[in-house]
Every structure is written in structure tokens, then in C-alpha cells.
């Protein structure tokens, strides 16, 4: 299809690609290309046991930014290329959604969820997910490429309240919108197994397609040149602030009171398990430098750095939120519950004998096992909601994964996605992951809001991507920091069951937060010295 024809046919995307020099250090490339640039995203994956890098996806330029708050989605065109996509929203928005033109974008308003509908009807009703779904469904690629249409970003924990009735609570310091996603215009895909780098540009059809094609092609050339001339040391630099003490929004004593209060609801039969949390905070003048330290100190299966105009989110998460692969049609949840500190000597090195004894203690702890099995059952129920009958099963049960400061009990639940659903339906049905809420999910989420008395923001939500093929890969936002106004907010929770020890649960939140706290502090100390 010629550029002239593309100008008359909205809803198409032409992919422009170039092969680049292999980038063994994607963070250095991100720092070089995007250090002070909003609407940029770095997603990195690693093998669980070896911690070897697998793939890095680096979004340099975004065409659109989509922000959801409650039942409204604001779509902002960031480039002329992005403006070409805007007519699709008015053309394809489902019934029950209104589209209003605003400065540089659109405001889409959805009807509130109807509680009288059954679970399946609610899942298929028009919702804020349709703004994302529309882009993956109604933009067709002229040439096959998995990332021709690529949406990367974050779902907040509080998106759940758009679909379930939860107590109203105010914003906390972590005021991440219900979701923020970017539609990629230019990005890098780095495969660490084959040691290849691909530069990808997406040109969307519409009246400005000729100019957009030229602009995107030129941008890829500029990126290629920038990468070829990248300094040998492009590590992010930290700020000059003096390392400060860590503050916490809830003392050990207050958190222990929350645990005891929640245990009364467990004993009353209202819930089986619940995951309260608290927030640690400290100065973070350079979140990118802190992420570099976290990646070095605590490599994890999912590592991410999201740079918005108003905030940054970074983390090294051990836990998948929801994963869906179109080619296999498999939907997957990877529940993690049950935690112990690593066995370390006084100098911080791993004592392998002590470490193995701690693992045995974890595996034989009835409280930890009961907590984990409850969450596996919850994951089984969630996956069953969206799977073909008879295809859901537990692929792995009660394995142990190790990280820098802690080890975890893990399992894996999979199923074959129903033909009438997609990855966004699956995420909606499963959010939020039970390991961050409890069971039953809505009752536990209600009690979480009662004790925490504020929205969680990004913590306990998910970061990842959806592409035009229909694939989704997301991780839970844990072992993470939300950074705003040079302050990092690091939230961590603990699973509470009927025989939980309140002090142990308080200590667990500290253990879980420690890797991120250490990374922020180390980044500051390196600058100071």
C-alpha cells in the first residue's frame, strides 16, 4: 500500500525497522537516549534461576499517552503520528462510552460497572479497558511484526475500585493514575540470547502519514547514530543529596495492631487471608541511578523503569501478574507467597548451609504453606474464569525462588484462554493478584482499605505491555519505588492468616522493602563519595 493510499485508510500501521549493534547494557542506552525524557519506558526480563538477561524492550518515543482515572480515560497525542490514531476512538468506541475532544486529545467516559450483571456479562461490558483494546484490535499491521502496535505502561492497584465496590479513601503519596500506557512510536527490542538489537518505528496511517513516515525514519537514523556514538560509560548519575534516614508511615506497633485487627476478621470467617502493607520513604534525587543499583544488587525476572512527566516507577519484581501468549493461547499466573530472609554471614555473603536450612524451614512451615495454598486456589479460580473448560491446571507447586535479600515459595497456574476473550479480559478478571490482596478478594480488598486508609497507587498493580498480536506480559509492582518530587515511596506487605505472628509480619515488610531501600541509599552514597 502506497503512502498516498495510507493517507486515506486510517487504522493501519507501517513498521520501519533497522538492525543495530547489540546492546549488552540496555540501561546505559536508556540513560543515553531518555534520561530526562517523559513518556519513556524500559522493560527487562531475566531467567529466574541464573538471573541471565533474556530480553529488553526500550520505548524511546511515544505517539499517544493514555491515562485512566475512575471511569474516564484521557488520550493525549504526543506527536503528529499519534494524531493520526485519534479518529479510531470515535469510530470504534463501544456503545455506552462517550468521546469528547479536548486540547491535544480526547476524553473518553464510560458508564459505571453495573453490579446487577453476572460475572461474565460484567467482564464483557464496555469499560476503560476498551481504550487500550481498541488500539490493539483496530490497528492492523501492513507487515507482520510482534511490536508493530506496542502499548507499555502500568495498571494501578486501585483500578480494581472501578469494577468492585470498595470504601472511598483519599490519594496517598503514591498517586499513580488507575492506568498510564504509552503507544510506541520508536523503540528498541534487544534479545540477549541471540545478541541482537532491533530499532522499530511505527507509522500510523492518516492524512499526515507521509510526514510521519519521514519523521519516524529520520528518528531511527538519529537513534542509530546516538547509539553508535554512545560513551563507554553511560551509567546514570545520582543526585547530590546526603543519604537520609528512612521514614515509615506506620510504626511496627501500629502495623501489629492492624494484623491483630485483621485476624479477628479471619477468625470471624469474613476472610481467609489478607495482605496489609505500609510505606517506607526516603530522598531519591536520581531514580534512574537507584534503579541501576537495584538491578545490580537484586536481579529479578522482571525489571522495569517507567518515566512519566510527573513521576517515575522502578522495580525488580519476582512475580508475574498476568502473562498471555497468543501463539500458545496460554494464560498464566505465578503466585508467590511465603518468605524468608537469605542465609547470610556477617559480611553479607551467602552461607549456603544456613541458606538451605532456612529453605527447609520455609518448606515445612505450616503457616507459610497454608497461606501459599490459599493463594494457589485463588489463582486457580481466577484462571478458570477465563479458561476453556478443563484446561486450567497447576503447572508448578511449592517451588523456591531466591533473590538478594529473600527467598519465596512459588507456584504456576495456567489455562487456555476462552475464544471469546482476550488478554485484557483476563487481566480484568484476575486483578489484583491475590498475593497482594488476599482471599476472598473483594472482602480482603475492603479490609485493606479500612486499615491503610489511602489508595495504594502503583503498588500491587502491574507494569508491562500489550501488543497488536494480542500478547500480554506484566509483573506485579512489588520490590519497587514510586518516585515523585525527589522522594521514593517503597511499599511492602505481608500475608496474614489465622496463625500469623504480628511481629513477624511487620519484620517481613521490612525485609521485602530492604532491597529497594538499599539501592536508593547506595545510589546516593556513590554520588557523595
Where are each of the predicted segments found?
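Extended alpha-helical targeting/anchoring segments
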Residues: 1-529
Amino acid at each position: 500500500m502506497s503512502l498516498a493510499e495510507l493517507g486515506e485508510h486510517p487504522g493501519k500501521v507501517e513498521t520501519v525497522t533497522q538492525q543495530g549493534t547489540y546492546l549488552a547494557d540496555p540501561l546505559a542506552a536508556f540513560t543515553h537516549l531518555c534520561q530526562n525524557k517523559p513518556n519513556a519506558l524500559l522493560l527487562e526480563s531475566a531467567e529466574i534461576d541464573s538471573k541471565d538477561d533474556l530480553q529488553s524492550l526500550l520505548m524511546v518515543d511515544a505517539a499517544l499517552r493514555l491515562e485512566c482515572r475512575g471511569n474516564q480515560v484521557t488520550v493525549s497525542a504526543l506527536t503528529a503520528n499519534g494524531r493520526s490514531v485519534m479518529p479510531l476512538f470515535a469510530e470504534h468506541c463501544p456503545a455506552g462510552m462517550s468521546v469528547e475532544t479536548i486540547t491535544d486529545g480526547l476524553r473518553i467516559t464510560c458508564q459505571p460497572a453495573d453490579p446487577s450483571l453476572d460475572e461474565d456479562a460484567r467482564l464483557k461490558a464496555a469499560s476503560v479497558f476498551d481504550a487500550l483494546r481498541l488500539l490493539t484490535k483496530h490497528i492492523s499491521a501492513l507487515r507482520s511484526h510482534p511490536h508493530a502496535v506496542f502499548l507499555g505502561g502500568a495498571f494501578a492497584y486501585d483500578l480494581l475500585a472501578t469494577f468492585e465496590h470498595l470504601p472511598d479513601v483519599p490519594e496517598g503519596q503514591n498517586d499513580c493514575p488507575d492506568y498510564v500506557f504509552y503507544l510506541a512510536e520508536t523503540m528498541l527490542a534487544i534479545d540477549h540470547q541471540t545478541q541482537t538489537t532491533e530499532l522499530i518505528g511505527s507509522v500510523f496511517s492518516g492524512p499526515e502519514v507521509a510526514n510521519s513516515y519521514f519523521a519516524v525514519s529520520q528518528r531511527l537514523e538519529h537513534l542509530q547514530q546516538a547509539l553508535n556514538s554512545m560513551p563507554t560509560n553511560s551509567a546514570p548519575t545520582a543526585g547530590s543529596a546526603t543519604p537520609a534516614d528512612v521514614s515509615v508511615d506506620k510504626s511496627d506497633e501500629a502495623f501489629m495492631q492492624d494484623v491483630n485487627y485483621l485476624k479477628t476478621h479471619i477468625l470471624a470467617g469474613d476472610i481467609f487471608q489478607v495482605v496489609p502493607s505500609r510505606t517506607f520513604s526516603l530522598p531519591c534525587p536520581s531514580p534512574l541511578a537507584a534503579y541501576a543499583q537495584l538491578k545490580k544488587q537484586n536481579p529479578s525476572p522482571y525489571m522495569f523503569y517507567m518515566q512519566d512527566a510527573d513521576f517515575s516507577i522502578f522495580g525488580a519484581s519476582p512475580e508475574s501478574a498476568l502473562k498471555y501468549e497468543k501463539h500458545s493461547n496460554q494464560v498464566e499466573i505465578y503466585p508467590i507467597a511465603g518468605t524468608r530472609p537469605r542465609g547470610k554471614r556477617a559480611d553479607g555473603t551467602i552461607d549456603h548451609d544456613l541458606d538451605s536450612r532456612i529453605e527447609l524451614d520455609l518448606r515445612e512451615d505450616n503457616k507459610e504453606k497454608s497461606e501459599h495454598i490459599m493463594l494457589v486456589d485463588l489463582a486457580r479460580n481466577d484462571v478458570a474464569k477465563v479458561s476453556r473448560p478443563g484446561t486450567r491446571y497447576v503447572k508448578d507447586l511449592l517451588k523456591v525462588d531466591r533473590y538478594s535479600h529473600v527467598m519465596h515459595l512459588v507456584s504456576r497456574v495456567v489455562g487456555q484462554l476462552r475464544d471469546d476473550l482476550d488478554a485484557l479480559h483476563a487481566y480484568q478478571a484476575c486483578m489484583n493478584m491475590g498475593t497482594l490482596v488476599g482471599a476472598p478478594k473483594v472482602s480482603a480488598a475492603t479490609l485493606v482499605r479500612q486499615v491503610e486508609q489511602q489508595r495504594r497507587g502503583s503498588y500491587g498493580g502491574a507494569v508491562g505491555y500489550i501488543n497488536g498480536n494480542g500478547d500480554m506480559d506484566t509483573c506485579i509492582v512489588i520490590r519497587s519505588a514510586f518516585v515523585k518530587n525527589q522522594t521514593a515511596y517503597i511499599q511492602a506487605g505481608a500475608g496474614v492468616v489465622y496463625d500469623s505472628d504480628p511481629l513477624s509480619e511487620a519484620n517481613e515488610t521490612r525485609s521485602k522493602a530492604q532491597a529497594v531501600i538499599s539501592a536508593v541509599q547506595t545510589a546516593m552514597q556513590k554520588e557523595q563519595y
